[in-house]
Structure formats: structure tokens, C-alpha cells
Amino acid sequence: VAEQGKHAPVLLILGQRGWQAERVFEQLDRPEELQGHVQELGTCNDEELAGWIGGARALLMPSFAEGFGLPVFEALELGTPVIASDLPVFREVGGGIPTYLDPQDSAAWKRTIEAFCADGPERQRQVAEIGAFQAPTWGDHFAKVEVWLARL
């Protein structure tokens, strides 16, 4: 926002504020600097959520830890490109489609977000590949579990 001013992209944060993210929220709670560029929506229904994610330029998941990665799954199902931390759970859910980044490399995140806003080649690659996304099923999950259990 400091560099791009009114041309900076809008960041919409969906969901409740998480734990152990106080420093992030300190930055977000400076409305005079971020007004109009950062918006928070704590709750919404499933239809609204699908509309927000489906209409996004990209879903951003700069996480340090995740249990399953449901937002990545939802975004890909809705045809929305994903920029996510390079975590095993995100790779398991998204395969080779999302763009994976080190969650601590803020310069890489900035470059990638700017490239996605400009519809750069990496975003175009994802858009082209999303149609082939195969969501994991319970059958897939249990097939893996059964193989694992057979090894015990």
C-alpha cells in the first residue's frame, strides 16, 4: 500500500482471527494506512463464501501450520488460483496446481501477488490446470489408510 497507493490490490480476510498471529493483527489494525485495501469478514454463509472465493484473483494461504487445508481445496474446486505456503498438507490437497512459497519469504509473496494481479504466466498456468483438479474423496483417503494399516 505504501508503494502502490490507491492501485494496491484489496486483501479480503475471510474467517475468524487465528491464534498466535498477534503481530499480523497489529499491522491490520492500522485502518488509516490500510483503509480500503484490507477488509475482514469474520463470518459468512456457505453461499457467500463460495462467491468471495470464486470471485477472487487468488486465494492466499501464508500459513505456518495447517490441519487439512480446506480453503485450498475449496478454491481449486471453484476455479480460483492458489498461492500457499509450501506445507505438505497443501501439496497433498492441491498437488502441482498451487504456487508454493516459503511463508517467511515476504519478498517472494509480494512479487507473486503482484504477478497474479497482472495475470502473469504463473496465474495463467494455474487457470489452465485447474480444470483437471481432482478433489480427494473419502474413498481415496480410506484406500491410503488401508494400505498403511496393512503394513502394520
Please provide the spans of the model-predicted regions.
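Conserved acidic donor-binding segment of nucleotide-sugar-dependent glycosyltransferases
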Residues: T99-A107, E114-G120
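A charged, aromatic-enriched C-terminal amphipathic alpha-helix characteristic of glycosyltransferases
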Residues: P121-L152
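Nucleotide-activated donor-binding/catalytic signature segment of Leloir-type glycosyltransferases, i.e.
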Residues: G15, E22-A50
